Amino acid sequence: MAQCVRSTLNPVRTPQSFTRKAYVKSPAFASVSFLRAVPEFNKYPKPCSLVMSCQGKAQNQQEERPQLSLDDLVTSNRKGEVLGTIKDSLSNCLSETNLLATVPGLKSRIKGKVRDIYDAGDYLVLITTDRLSAFDRNLASIPFKGQVLNETSLWWFNNTQHITPNAIVSSPDRNVVIAKKCSVFPIEFVVRGYVTGSTDTSLWTVYNKGVRNYCGNELSDGLVKNQKLPANILTPTTKAADHDVPISPNEIVEGGFMTQAEFDEASMKALSLFEFGQGVAKKHGLILVDTKYEFGRSSDGSILLIDEIHTPDSSRYWLAGSYEERFQKGLEPENVDKEFLRLWFKENCNPYEDEVLPAAPAELVTELAWRYIFLYETITGSRIDIIPTQEPIHDRISRNTSQALSSLRQL
């Protein structure tokens, strides 16, 4: 299996289709395990311990850290520790939710590709499921994927509060966050540090066609695929039907999507978040290549970070140690993502046209679950609690969400 996985680690990657959610704010967290007073989230280190510019011991530790390699992914002892739990959980994934039937006070549900959003009056409840989405459809359910995505975002939300306030009120369950409602800007702030990608709207695709002004960014001649840009750039998109449409800052303002002041503030936040994320990723042997952010305005007028941040579903990560050598040789960067499973579906069916798709092999589902865990633990420097349970995840989520909402309504 290791050899099979290793041979498919780095196919040409198609950037994710970034999905928009309508949700909200908050400057503070509860415990990941259950809603405690609301403002405490002590699981993770302070932001300054993660910033590349921190001096002294943290910087020395960074310099001494061995380079991350594919061997760490394929032969890690940690992989052996979690594989059994992953396999035991293949039949207990969170594929669908129906909290309208199990949690009092919920009014409606919006089902997204991965997240289900419930209206709870003053709050929204966001459930991150284990669904794997690609080719504009769900391909499989991956054990612990929802938990890993949720806790990855929580970790980043917690450690970027010095840059921007965010949408989270509490996290009463490993798959759940509760947020206050706000008015969501219909723009996705895509930030890129490299010329890469293969979809119609990716930077390399449009650049290779001769485009030298993309979303208001002037691009010089002579760039090659996967090259690092002289500076990070913002390439916003807006939603039209089911696809992203690139848009320039002038078009955003002239089209009434945002005011100039709103766009300027959100842009500054997005670029600052990306720079911070690159520093954290570099510290842990990774390159944060590109990502997307979404923002909304709260009832008090503040611009808040919403949705998710720097997850493996919304971001592209490469291995830093081998990047330069592979770039010089014209090879694709080594990466850690879901592309190998996408490739399996493309080789075994037509995922765009076939009405019924084959079931993903259990060994590939297990491998992808491990990759999500690996990326979380690599970025955060801490182990995620992967707890096997016989209790259906939906029952646990319903119980914890009900208790959390009841506590919030009493505040």
UniProtKB/Swiss-Prot annotation:
Coiled coil: none annotated. Gene3D superfamilies: ATP-grasp fold, B domain (3.30.470.20), Phosphorylase Kinase, domain 1 (3.30.200.20). GO terms for biological process: 'de novo' IMP biosynthetic process; response to auxin. Transmembrane segments: none annotated. Its EC number is 6.3.2.6. GO terms for cellular component: chloroplast; chloroplast stroma. Pathway: Purine metabolism; IMP biosynthesis via de novo pathway; 5-amino-1-(5-phospho-D-ribosyl)imidazole-4-carboxamide from 5-amino-1-(5-phospho-D-ribosyl)imidazole-4-carboxylate: step 1/2. It is found in: Plastid, Chloroplast. It is an enzyme of class 6 (ligase). This is Phosphoribosylaminoimidazole-succinocarboxamide synthase, chloroplastic. It comes from Arabidopsis thaliana.
